[in-house]
Regions:
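Hydrophobic alpha-helical transmembrane segments of multi-pass membrane transport/permease proteins
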Residues: 1-15, 22-40, 80, 141-145, ...
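Alpha-helical transmembrane segments of multi-pass membrane transporters/translocases
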Residues: 2, 6-11, 81, 101, ...
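Transmembrane helix segments
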Residues: 9, 127-167, 171
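Transmembrane helix-loop junction
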Residues: 10-15, 47, 91, 95, ...
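Hydrophobic alpha-helical transmembrane segments of membrane proteins
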Residues: 14-44, 108-126, 179
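Transmembrane helix boundary and interhelical loop/hinge segments in multi-pass membrane proteins
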Residues: 38-60
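Alpha-helical transmembrane segments and their short interhelical loops
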Residues: 64-65, 70-139, 185-195, 206, ...
Length: 216
């Protein structure tokens, strides 16, 4: 779906000056990766839980840390596939061109920044039912995409919506990447924001899981 969105919307703005086509390519790549992290990843974990696979693992030499690392590794393979597909379409169909080092840097930052989406996916697994997880996932997915500026620049929104958008990880991830590509500099605020956002959510999940195990 993100690839189709990119082809459709970028086709409407092909004559837009500046780096619009490049930036929109990066936005749709992030959109694709977020879909995997917020939908596919929690669903896999929830399926394992419902099938009691996670309980079975506790009686094997495989630790839960190793279990999650394996799942995250598989998720990053999906991320690489998303990057490869969307980047290829952007380059071949929309003629987006960058130096090879910029393609690699953009891919690296997308993967690094996507840890924030992975953290969101893990938080969703804390919800008490699959139905609630699905509803919350859909709301977060669309909200982060639209309000965070992945579909359109947040400058088209009223000021109060722009203020909200700038507080979202999707917006800060794109700011991080664009600052690197445009200025060759580290966006300190975006880096700090994404790091703290990810660490807070990971900590929340760990604390909740440990508390649940103690109660069990």
């Amino acid at each position: 779906m993100p690839t189709a969105f990119y082809l459709f919307f970028s086709g409407m703005y092909q004559d837009t000056p500046g780096n619009f086509m490049r930036d929109y390519l990066l936005s749709m790549t992030a959109f694709s990766m977020m879909s995997t992290a917020i939908f596919s990843f929690p669903t896999v974990l929830e399926t394992d839980r419902l099938n009691n696979w996670q309980k079975v693992l506790r009686h094997t030499p495989v630790s839960m840390v190793e279990y999650y690392l394996i799942k995250v590794a598989g998720l990053f393979v999906d991320f690489l596939l998303s990057i490869g597909v969307v980047f290829t379409v952007g380059h071949v169909v929309r003629h987006v061109n960058m130096p090879i080092q910029d393609w690699v840097l953009a891919a690296f930052l997308l993967i690094l920044g996507s840890l924030a989406f992975v953290a969101i996916g893990l938080v969703l697994t804390l919800l008490p039912s699959s139905q609630l997880m699905s509803v919350a996932g859909n709301l977060l997915y669309m909200g982060l995409a639209v309000m965070g500026g992945l579909w359109m620049p947040i400058s088209v929104f009223p000021e109060w919506m722009q203020a909200i958008g700038k507080c979202l990880p999707t917006y800060q991830l794109m700011e991080l990447i664009k600052t690197f590509l445009n200025k060759g500099q580290v966006n300190g605020f975006a880096s700090l924001y994404l790091t703290l956002f990810t660490l807070v959510l990971f900590t929340l999940v760990i604390v909740y899981r440990r508390h649940s195990e103690v109660r069990a």
